[in-house]
Amino acid sequence: MAGFLTIGKLTQVGGTAQDLMLGTNATLTFNAGTVLNGNVTATTGRLYFNGATFNGKLTAIKTGPGSDESNGGNVFNNIVDITNASNGAIILYQNFDDLFNNDVLLSNTSSGQILTGQLTGTATLAATRIISVGASGFASGALSIGRLTQIGSTAQNFVLGSSASLTFGVGNTFNGTVSSTSGRLYLNGTTFNDSFTAVKTGFGSDASNGGNTYNGPTEITLASAGIMYLYHYSDDAFNDDLLFNNTSTGQILMGQFTGNAVLAAGRVIEVGAGGFTNGMLNIGRFTQIGPTPQNLVLGNGAALAFGTGSVFNGNVISSSGSLFYHGTTFNGTVRSTKNGPGNDTSRGGNIFNGHTDITMTATGSMNLYSTANDIYNADLRLSNTSVGQFRLGNPVAGSQLKLLFHAVLIAPVHVYVV
């Protein structure tokens, strides 16, 4: 069956179930002024929701290609269960506001997308209700949630497959705890008012725009060889503790472009219970408010980088296999241990305003400030409990060591001072 079926300004009296079965080349539209009091089941190639009220359960399946942009303006008073069974896109509440007064279940059985709130439309999820993946699963494709406000504190849980991507988009507000698992993960402008726990299980480099506010504890786990970029373009605010885990070999990179982040006073950034055995953690453009001590303990196979534009106002302790200083200001003491055998070359450009104590416990080397000047405004102590080497400066780049007090070098250590 092909063609168009548009239902508008229709009021159903009574609760008889309605079943609308159209072909993959057909289009079904629920238009403004329609009120359906019974359960509605629909299967169609293309699907639009443009201002209807559903008082019974809605079950809808899109089977055809194409991007279907629903205007919005709908009221859903019962469960909504929408499945994308195509490589096309379902776009909900694009221009006007939707109201979800019951659970919202979204599934994808093909490679298509379900996108919500991508333009000016918004949505409200009623108190005690959830938005989640439906019984058919979300093994691949993309789910993007935008401009959705959750009323109340009901926990939300999103479980997608390792080939699927999940985006928390612009204008969302979640008032309950949020947990998610997905192959790819993007954080692009959402406010989380309770705890947020996320796991990335798939490959690929995921660059989150940023612009998020985290008012509860945040715990992010990388369980793949992929890359997670946080606050790449816009600023994030972490108003509670920030925990990172890496259970594979991937990288978590923060503030690598124009975005910045602020960690609230009294809060910590540290490794979570899942550990950070391998891979990389790069902390860039990150400002800690207040003097709370920070402790970053990574495994011997993991790399830790203190990146450009970061400011730590508390004492910092770190342990990692590889260690890099790429342009951070430390206003407290620094005590770092390198436990891995690699040759680590730091760019430099750091300011150490407190006592700095760096220890190597393995073979390999550490080259400090290779391309930009470091400033040490308190004692520098270098220790070596193995046979590795410290190299201070790079004569080719013309860098220098500036000591306003003095350096203490503990044997046995091979040190080159330029």
PLM features: residue spans?
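Extracellular beta-strand-rich, repetitive "passenger/adhesive" scaffolds
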Residues: M1-V75, D81-I351, H355-V418
